[in-house]
Amino acid sequence: MKRALISVSDKTGIVAFAQGLVAADFEIISTGGTFSVLEKAGVPVTPIDEVTHFPEMLDGRVKTLHPNIHGGLLAKRDEPTHMAALAEHEIAPIDLVCVNLYPFKETIQKPEITQEQAIEQIDIGGPSMLRSAAKNFKSVYVVVDQADYDETLAQLQQDDVTYRRHLAAKAFRHTAAYDSLIAGYLSDADAVEFPEKLSLTYDFKQALRYGENAHQKAAFYQSALPSAFSIAAAHQLHGKELSYNNIKDADAAIKVAAEFSEPCVVAMKHMNPCGVGLGTTIYDAWQKAFAADSVSIFGGIIALNREVDVQTANALHELFLEIVIAPSFAPEALAILEKKKNIRLMTLDFEQAAKADRFETVSVLGGLLVQERDRLTDQASELKTVTTKAPTEDEKEALLFAQRVVKHVKSNAIVVATKGQTLGVGAGQMNRVGSVKIALEQALANGMQAPFVLASDAFFPMDDSVAYAAEHGITAIIQPGGSIKDQDSIDMANQKGVSMVFTNRRHFKH
C-alpha cells in the first residue's frame, strides 16, 4: 500500500481528495487540524505521531521534522542503499505529499497583527516536506494547489514522471514565493531599501491576448501584496478583458489623476497625457481635458478622481474610448456607459493613492532597475524667480499645475497650460526645442488664446526654446535649471519679457 501525507491549512476540497486517494489504495497520514477533519468525515487516517513515534512539541512548531518523514520522502526508490537504509530504520516510503502552508500572506495583511503574531504564521515543517517531496519527484507526487487535486487523482494510474516534475516545479515556485514574502516583511520592518538579494513575488492574474503587438505573447501578474491604489486592485465593471497596452496606459493615467485633490480628468494616449483638466466639478474638469486635445483623445484612456455623473457619462458616451476608470459611477451614469459594448469601465479607490507602491522597477537585458517613484511635488515656496519679471499669482498657479503634469510625460517633455488645463503636450522628442514646438503648435491649432505658461521636465541646454516659446505666446516658464548655459536662457527670457522660475528638481521620465 502506498502512503500519502496530508497537512493543509486551507481544508477546501481536502476530504474528497483524501477519499480519492483511499480509493486508489493509499494509506493517509495526517497532522493536527487536518487529521481531525478527515477523521470526522470518515476517512481512514493515521496520526503523524504514530509514524514519527514522537509527540508534537513546542506548541506545534515541531511535528513533521523527523527522519521517519523526510527519509520516507527523500529515499530514491531505485537506489538499493537508500531502500536498505529505510528497512534498517523501519521507515516506510511516502509516495504523495499534499501541503498548503500557514496563511502568512493573509496574516500580515491584517492591520492589527503584531510582528510576533506574524512570525507564528511562518511555516517550517510544510515547506520542508514540500522541498523533500519535490526533490524526489521521480517517485513522489507533491501537491500544493487545490486546483490540482482532481488531475492528480487521474494521474495516479499513469505513473507519469513528467506530471510529477510539473508538480515539483510548482511546489518550488510556491515555497520560493512564500519565503520571498517573509523576507520582504522582515526587510520592511528592518527598513532595508535595497537588499543584497531582491526577490519579488507576483501571482498570475490573467492571460492577455497578446503584448504590445499581436506577435508578442503576454500575461498580467499582480504583486502578491498589491497596494490598494493600483491597476491590479481596480475592479472592472464592464467591457472586454484588458489588453497589455490598456493596463500600461491605465496605470499611467491614474498616477496623473492622483496628483490632484481637485476634481481632475486625465486623457491618456500611448503612456502620455494628451489632456488634463481641473474643475469645480468633474464635468467641468472633463470639458477642459477634452478641449485640450479633442483629436488625440480618440481611443484613449480616461481617468477621473471623482464619481462619474450623468452629465459626464453622456459626454463620454459620444466618444470611442478604451477605458474609463474612476472611484465610482452614479447608477444612471453606469447605465449610459454600459450601452457601449466594448468600453471598459473600472473603479479604483483614489483615496488610497498615498498607499501606492513606493518603488518601481524596469527590466533590462540581464537585470532589473529599481528606483523610488517620482512622488515629489514642486511647491510654490521652493520656486526661485531668476528673471527680472516675476510670475503673477495666476501664472504661478498655472506653472505648478503644468509642472505636476510634465513629470508624467516622456522626456524630453514640455507642457503648455493655463490654470487647471493643459493646452499642448510635447513628448518624447530627442531635442527639447522639438517638444516645445509640438506643444505650442498643438495649443495654437486647438484655437487656444495666449497667454500661456510652459513647464519643462529638465533644463534648457540653449536659449532657443525660450525664444520660440516667447514668440508664440508664453508669458511664464518653469524649469529645473542646472544647465551651464542657464544664463543664456535667463537673458533671453528677460529680453522677451518672460518670467522664469527654477525648481532645482528634474523630472525625467524615460
From Swiss-Prot:
Report the residue ranges that make up the MGS-like domain in this protein.
1-144
Q: Which SUPFAM superfamilies does the record cross-reference, listed alphabetically?
A: Cytidine deaminase-like, Methylglyoxal synthase-like
Question: Coiled coil located at which positions?
Answer: none
What GO molecular-function term can you cite, just one?
A: phosphoribosylaminoimidazolecarboxamide formyltransferase activity
Report keywords, A-Z: Hydrolase, Multifunctional enzyme, Purine biosynthesis, Transferase
A single GO cellular-component term from the record reads: cytosol
Which biological process terms from the Gene Ontology are attached to this UniProt entry? Answer: 'de novo' IMP biosynthetic process
Reaction(s) catalysed by this chain, per the record, are: (6R)-10-formyltetrahydrofolate + 5-amino-1-(5-phospho-beta-D-ribosyl)imidazole-4-carboxamide = 5-formamido-1-(5-phospho-D-ribosyl)imidazole-4-carboxamide + (6S)-5,6,7,8-tetrahydrofolate; IMP + H2O = 5-formamido-1-(5-phospho-D-ribosyl)imidazole-4-carboxamide
Q: Which CDD domains match?
A: IMPCH
One Pfam annotation reads: AICARFT_IMPCHas
> What is its pathway?
Purine metabolism; IMP biosynthesis via de novo pathway; 5-formamido-1-(5-phospho-D-ribosyl)imidazole-4-carboxamide from 5-amino-1-(5-phospho-D-ribosyl)imidazole-4-carboxamide (10-formyl THF route): step 1/1; Purine metabolism; IMP biosynthesis via de novo pathway; IMP from 5-formamido-1-(5-phospho-D-ribosyl)imidazole-4-carboxamide: step 1/1
In the Enzyme Commission scheme, what number(s) does this protein have? Answer: 2.1.2.3, 3.5.4.10
Q: What HAMAP family has UniProt attached to this entry?
A: PurH
Q: Which PANTHER family match?
A: BIFUNCTIONAL PURINE BIOSYNTHESIS PROTEIN ATIC (PTHR11692:SF0), BIFUNCTIONAL PURINE BIOSYNTHESIS PROTEIN PURH (PTHR11692)
Comment block on domains: The IMP cyclohydrolase activity resides in the N-terminal region.
Q: Which family does it belong to?
A: Belongs to the PurH family.
Q: Which NCBIfam families match?
A: PRK00881.1, purH
Q: What is this protein called?
A: Bifunctional purine biosynthesis protein PurH
Whichever gene encodes this chain, its name is: purH
